[in-house]
């Protein structure tokens, strides 16, 4: 069930981080990346979780110069995880667009 909820919420989290980056919103980057980091760790997606942590730290330290690049890396990592998420959820209709 956690996988299904995560898949449903993932596009919103990614949109939130992307929007915060576009608006140079340090707090928004940190907050949304922190929210995203939790389920990534719970599901065992440690590389993606570490990338979300990097974004969170960038936001908290007001050092978002590389946030766009880090977000791109996180998006690519999540795209690689999509087949596993679909397999774990058993529901192909929940495929996400991590771009």
Please provide the spans of the model-predicted regions:
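Long, amphipathic alpha-helical coiled-coil segments characteristic
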Residues: 1-35, 39-42, 46, 61, ...
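Hydrophobic, amphipathic alpha-helical faces that serve as interaction scaffolds
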Residues: 51-60
């Amino acid at each position: 069930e956690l996988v299904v909820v995560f898949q449903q919420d993932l596009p919103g989290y990614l949109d939130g981080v992307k929007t915060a980056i576009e608006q140079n919103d340090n707090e928004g980057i940190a907050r949304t990346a922190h929210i995203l980091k939790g389920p990534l760790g719970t599901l065992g997606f440690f590389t993606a979780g570490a990338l979300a942590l990097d974004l969170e730290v960038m936001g908290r330290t007001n050092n978002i110069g590389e946030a766009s690049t880090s977000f791109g890396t996180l998006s690519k990592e999540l795209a690689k995880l999509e087949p596993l998420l679909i397999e774990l959820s058993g529901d192909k209709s929940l495929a996400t667009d991590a771009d």
